[in-house]
């Protein structure tokens, strides 16, 4: 059996006459002719306008700031955001600069701290709120009130010992001791006796003093910490640098080397880690953006192999990109975690319009003048590219219907970027080309360059031309399989609840500040870092709130407790104070009598006074607590006690989205017996709301993106049947994408010697979800351009369309995919997952638009030609074409 020669293109039936101005361009030809004349005759004036607008946009864009807080992703009117903001406004100093001093021995460290603290306290109050070098203040207070804080049982024991000894001494002095030996008598009234009784529990437990000498010093005495609390919010980089500069000046003046030549000073605390994290994120976004733009421009250069073309396209997309971020400043004012990496995406998608325009311009330039080539490119590409830009804008715009601020901002910037890049391309790219050709005309393509350009589309053209039925049928079958996988994926709850997979992981590991923070936490304690604050309006609401929360916890089943405990300022007050006061006063009275009667020496008397409360005794109140001990419960205005903390459950991770939702719901809203409602918020509630927003808003955004894109396709093709072909191609690409996501983490294992496939899809988070609606609009680009060029060239073959336009369309996909793949190098795992998801969508829609669609068109041509030949043979009006393609093997 001999091999069959490749089939030739069957003659295409003449395209129906189309008087539509949207397709023929006749109605708009005058407009494009005038525009092209201006662009090619006066390119300098046109580009001067471009330069002026770019400078203005650049000045605005340079003022954009980056906000990394998760609360920036939620709407400003979201209750959790409002409540969290209200709590933060009332919380006292929260930012901490920790000064970490290391040295070979403890005593020089303590002396240096004693010398440094007074100097730090002299710094301006707008920089330094307080300087905490240890627990000296709290220790002094609790030592003076040791009997109040001792367990009632211990106070009763001391009371009984004092009364018994006093009675023993009185009887002994009166001669009524009945010969009792001192060995059997109650212990003498000394300070040592009182101290010993109160310290029995501590000694029995074997607990060591966590703060030797009252300092925050590491066991072994090689590290000591000073906590400098400041009103500067974490993330205020300018004021943080100012504080560091002044603190360094003070440290240099005190000079640690005077105390020990080996002594070193470093910084940590949330003020430093926030600055590091901001810098890491900013640098990461910059690197990802530069890497993405470099890859995009590199692949464009490899397609055209002309520096001039690369520069022209780079300049035109730079105009649109600069406009985009200039308007971003005017409309929004900042970037957030969802929009900070959009530079590469805007460039990767925005350059596609220039690629399509340039491909047609270069093709026309072979036989036409600059003006005619530019006019041809205008007339023949504007509709397809505008439809693609509109579809992309609608896809991004679908995010505006959500309540999620991160989605809205992404939609505004992305959608605006697509349209502004289209405008920038069609306004200024022709002038850039015209000006460059005045200097030196672009030589026609030949040899390697021409073959290289054709090479982009040639593999697709070869497959679609020679195996149309196989490709089309395989595409449909894979689409059906992907659709089934998509249904399974959606029903399996694809939301990412493991929040560790959305955080930032530095490439270099933990910084010195992070390492020191871990060591300092072990010395100082986490000081409520895991708990969340709930704010009440009145102090009398604290107890009812606590009771309501504890009742809610008690009602939860074992193993599903939403939190461990509730903490308020009243936990810092001694218990059984009235009873203890009665016992202390009675004991103090007996000791006083014993001293006056000579039962207690003057030296013991003075020592005992240090352990006995002086003056008139009254219960210790919240205002009596030292500032250091009560700091967590003190508001900015000095009000105490209106803060209640709720501590997460032990053994349940605050990075588990399921638990976060449970925890958040347990204190989000609490109704007190008097009818007042207390709202809670914080990181847990905001995280939970982010997850819930993804679940609620994802279907809405996807539906609107699909509907909007379908309308644009129908409008672009005037509702003709070919629009349905484009829509079907887009649908095929989307199910390919979803099928790919559903297999993201699939595992093939052997079970009993038989292969077993476990399907685990990519989980959707607050960022990668965006890839779904935008892939709808951007993915329509490829099918739109191929079908439009196919209709405009009724005498051309599918193979020629794919080689010429398909090559440019493939390049468009490459630029977009590379922009997305650059995101996978990010240190933020949410951005990485978005990059993969969006790239999967691009590749899927490319395969559908540049391989399956041409294969279908080619197969349809063959079938139509065959039917026409059969019809002619039957009627006898014409002979079968001698070069008609033989049936496929």
Where are these regions (language model features)?
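Signature of alpha-helical transmembrane segments and their immediate interfacial
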Residues: 17-68, 431, 446-495, 824, ...
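Solvent-exposed, non-transmembrane loop/terminal regulatory segments of multi-pass membrane proteins
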Residues: 61-104, 110, 202-215, 461-463, ...
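Juxtamembrane segments of multi-pass membrane proteins
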Residues: 96, 468-598
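Alpha-helical transmembrane helix bundles of large polytopic membrane transport and channel proteins
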Residues: 111-224, 239, 243, 260, ...
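Extracytoplasmic
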Residues: 182-307, 550-553, 609-709
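Interfacial segments of transmembrane alpha-helices in multi-pass membrane proteins
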Residues: 283-335, 401-405, 703-761, 825
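Pore- and gate-forming transmembrane helices of large, multi-pass membrane proteins
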Residues: 285-287, 314, 353, 366-402, ...
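Hydrophobic, glycine/alanine-rich multi-pass transmembrane helices and their short helix-loop junctions
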Residues: 299, 325-328, 386-429, 433-436, ...
